[in-house]
Design a protein with these regions (language model features):
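Gly/Ala-rich beta-loop-alpha elbow adjacent to hydrolase catalytic centers
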Residues: 38-43, 47
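Divalent metal-coordination and catalytic microenvironments
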Residues: 10, 35, 111, 158
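Conserved hydrolase catalytic core segment
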Residues: 49-58
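Alpha/beta-hydrolase-fold serine-hydrolase catalytic core, especially in secreted/extracellular enzymes
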Residues: 116-119, 125-170
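The feature captures the conserved acid-bearing segment of alpha/beta-hydrolase catalytic domains
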Residues: 58-121
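Alpha/beta-hydrolase active-site loop
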Residues: 1-29
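Extracytoplasmic/secreted proteins, especially bacterial periplasmic and envelope-associated proteins
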Residues: 5, 9-12, 46, 149, ...
Length: 170
Protein backbone atom coordinates (compact mmCIF):
# COMPACT_ATOMS: atom_id res chain seq x y z
CA UNK A 1 0.00 0.00 0.00
CA UNK A 2 2.85 2.39 0.80
CA UNK A 3 4.57 1.85 -2.56
CA UNK A 4 1.24 2.22 -4.38
CA UNK A 5 0.66 5.51 -2.54
CA UNK A 6 4.09 6.75 -3.55
CA UNK A 7 3.35 5.73 -7.13
CA UNK A 8 0.24 7.92 -7.03
CA UNK A 9 2.36 10.77 -5.65
CA UNK A 10 4.82 10.39 -8.54
CA UNK A 11 2.01 10.30 -11.09
CA UNK A 12 0.60 13.52 -9.59
CA UNK A 13 4.06 15.10 -9.73
CA UNK A 14 4.52 14.08 -13.37
CA UNK A 15 1.08 15.48 -14.20
CA UNK A 16 2.01 18.78 -12.58
CA UNK A 17 5.41 18.96 -14.29
CA UNK A 18 4.46 17.74 -17.74
CA UNK A 19 0.83 18.79 -18.10
CA UNK A 20 -0.51 21.67 -20.19
CA UNK A 21 -0.09 24.17 -17.33
CA UNK A 22 3.04 23.09 -15.42
CA UNK A 23 3.22 24.01 -11.74
CA UNK A 24 6.94 24.77 -11.85
CA UNK A 25 8.43 27.62 -13.81
CA UNK A 26 11.35 25.46 -14.95
CA UNK A 27 9.19 22.53 -16.08
CA UNK A 28 10.47 23.00 -19.62
CA UNK A 29 13.73 21.44 -18.36
CA UNK A 30 11.93 18.12 -17.86
CA UNK A 31 12.33 15.80 -20.84
CA UNK A 32 8.77 14.56 -21.08
CA UNK A 33 9.62 11.64 -23.34
CA UNK A 34 12.58 10.22 -21.37
CA UNK A 35 11.50 9.75 -17.77
CA UNK A 36 13.20 7.24 -15.50
CA UNK A 37 12.73 6.50 -11.82
CA UNK A 38 15.10 5.13 -9.20
CA UNK A 39 14.52 4.64 -5.52
CA UNK A 40 16.03 3.17 -2.38
CA UNK A 41 14.13 0.84 -0.08
CA UNK A 42 10.37 1.45 -0.43
CA UNK A 43 11.29 4.02 -3.09
CA UNK A 44 12.69 1.22 -5.23
CA UNK A 45 9.43 -0.66 -4.93
CA UNK A 46 7.63 2.60 -5.75
CA UNK A 47 9.61 2.82 -9.00
CA UNK A 48 8.20 -0.53 -10.11
CA UNK A 49 4.72 0.32 -8.81
CA UNK A 50 4.77 3.59 -10.75
CA UNK A 51 5.89 1.84 -13.92
CA UNK A 52 3.03 -0.63 -13.51
CA UNK A 53 0.47 2.17 -13.74
CA UNK A 54 2.17 5.01 -15.63
CA UNK A 55 3.64 4.44 -19.10
CA UNK A 56 5.52 7.76 -18.93
CA UNK A 57 8.18 6.13 -16.74
CA UNK A 58 10.32 4.30 -19.28
CA UNK A 59 12.96 2.73 -17.02
CA UNK A 60 13.29 1.94 -13.32
CA UNK A 61 15.72 0.97 -10.61
CA UNK A 62 15.10 -0.66 -7.24
CA UNK A 63 18.04 -0.09 -4.90
CA UNK A 64 17.71 -2.67 -2.13
CA UNK A 65 13.95 -2.40 -1.60
CA UNK A 66 11.57 -5.24 -0.84
CA UNK A 67 8.78 -5.56 -3.41
CA UNK A 68 5.94 -5.06 -0.93
CA UNK A 69 3.76 -4.16 -3.91
CA UNK A 70 4.53 -6.93 -6.43
CA UNK A 71 5.41 -6.32 -10.05
CA UNK A 72 2.29 -7.30 -12.02
CA UNK A 73 2.27 -10.89 -13.25
CA UNK A 74 2.25 -9.63 -16.85
CA UNK A 75 5.30 -7.41 -16.25
CA UNK A 76 6.04 -3.78 -17.02
CA UNK A 77 5.22 -3.71 -20.74
CA UNK A 78 8.77 -4.66 -21.71
CA UNK A 79 10.37 -1.65 -20.02
CA UNK A 80 13.87 -2.05 -18.53
CA UNK A 81 14.46 -2.51 -14.82
CA UNK A 82 17.60 -2.77 -12.70
CA UNK A 83 17.82 -4.49 -9.33
CA UNK A 84 20.78 -3.23 -7.32
CA UNK A 85 21.14 -4.70 -3.85
CA UNK A 86 23.10 -5.95 -0.89
CA UNK A 87 24.06 -9.63 -0.54
CA UNK A 88 20.76 -10.39 1.24
CA UNK A 89 19.09 -9.54 -2.05
CA UNK A 90 21.08 -12.11 -4.01
CA UNK A 91 19.17 -14.77 -5.95
CA UNK A 92 17.75 -17.19 -3.41
CA UNK A 93 18.57 -14.70 -0.64
CA UNK A 94 16.60 -13.67 2.41
CA UNK A 95 14.10 -11.52 0.46
CA UNK A 96 12.08 -13.83 -1.77
CA UNK A 97 10.19 -10.89 -3.32
CA UNK A 98 13.22 -10.25 -5.54
CA UNK A 99 13.14 -13.82 -6.87
CA UNK A 100 9.39 -13.59 -7.46
CA UNK A 101 9.46 -10.21 -9.20
CA UNK A 102 12.61 -10.96 -11.21
CA UNK A 103 10.58 -13.59 -13.06
CA UNK A 104 7.85 -11.01 -13.73
CA UNK A 105 10.13 -8.37 -15.25
CA UNK A 106 9.54 -8.73 -18.98
CA UNK A 107 12.00 -6.24 -20.49
CA UNK A 108 15.74 -5.71 -20.33
CA UNK A 109 16.79 -6.51 -16.76
CA UNK A 110 19.86 -6.88 -14.58
CA UNK A 111 20.22 -8.08 -11.01
CA UNK A 112 23.40 -6.76 -9.42
CA UNK A 113 24.62 -7.58 -5.93
CA UNK A 114 27.12 -5.18 -4.35
CA UNK A 115 29.35 -7.22 -2.05
CA UNK A 116 30.24 -5.58 1.25
CA UNK A 117 27.11 -3.43 1.48
CA UNK A 118 24.19 -3.15 3.85
CA UNK A 119 20.73 -1.71 3.21
CA UNK A 120 21.67 1.77 4.40
CA UNK A 121 24.63 1.95 1.99
CA UNK A 122 22.24 2.53 -0.91
CA UNK A 123 21.29 5.91 0.57
CA UNK A 124 23.30 9.04 1.40
CA UNK A 125 23.71 8.09 5.05
CA UNK A 126 27.03 6.23 4.72
CA UNK A 127 28.57 9.16 2.80
CA UNK A 128 27.31 11.66 5.37
CA UNK A 129 28.49 9.47 8.26
CA UNK A 130 31.98 9.28 6.75
CA UNK A 131 32.04 13.05 6.27
CA UNK A 132 31.00 13.53 9.89
CA UNK A 133 33.83 11.26 11.04
CA UNK A 134 31.43 8.45 11.99
CA UNK A 135 32.11 5.68 9.47
CA UNK A 136 30.51 2.29 9.97
CA UNK A 137 33.27 0.13 11.49
CA UNK A 138 31.53 -3.02 10.23
CA UNK A 139 31.37 -1.90 6.59
CA UNK A 140 34.26 -2.95 4.35
CA UNK A 141 33.41 -0.15 1.89
CA UNK A 142 33.64 3.55 2.58
CA UNK A 143 30.59 5.70 1.99
CA UNK A 144 32.39 7.41 -0.89
CA UNK A 145 33.22 4.07 -2.56
CA UNK A 146 29.63 2.90 -2.22
CA UNK A 147 28.41 6.19 -3.71
CA UNK A 148 30.84 5.80 -6.64
CA UNK A 149 29.46 2.33 -7.36
CA UNK A 150 25.84 3.53 -7.17
CA UNK A 151 26.52 6.56 -9.38
CA UNK A 152 28.30 4.45 -11.99
CA UNK A 153 25.55 1.85 -12.34
CA UNK A 154 22.60 4.23 -12.08
CA UNK A 155 24.14 6.59 -14.65
CA UNK A 156 25.01 3.72 -17.00
CA UNK A 157 21.49 2.29 -16.75
CA UNK A 158 19.72 5.57 -17.51
CA UNK A 159 22.22 6.52 -20.22
CA UNK A 160 21.58 3.18 -21.91
CA UNK A 161 17.81 3.19 -21.65
CA UNK A 162 16.89 6.86 -21.84
CA UNK A 163 19.67 8.20 -24.08
CA UNK A 164 20.41 5.05 -26.12
CA UNK A 165 24.11 5.38 -25.29
CA UNK A 166 25.85 1.96 -25.17
CA UNK A 167 27.23 1.09 -21.73
CA UNK A 168 29.96 -1.56 -21.39
CA UNK A 169 29.45 -1.54 -17.60
CA UNK A 170 26.08 -3.20 -18.06
Amino acid sequence: RLAAGRAQDIEFLLDRLTGPRPAWRHADLVDRIRIGMAGHSIGGNAAAATMATDPRVLAGINMDGTFVTPVPADGLDGRPFLLLGMPGHSPGGSDDTWDRDWRRLDGWKRWLTVTGTAHIDFSDISVLADQAGLPDPDSPLSGERTAQIMRAYVTAFFDLHLRATPQPLL
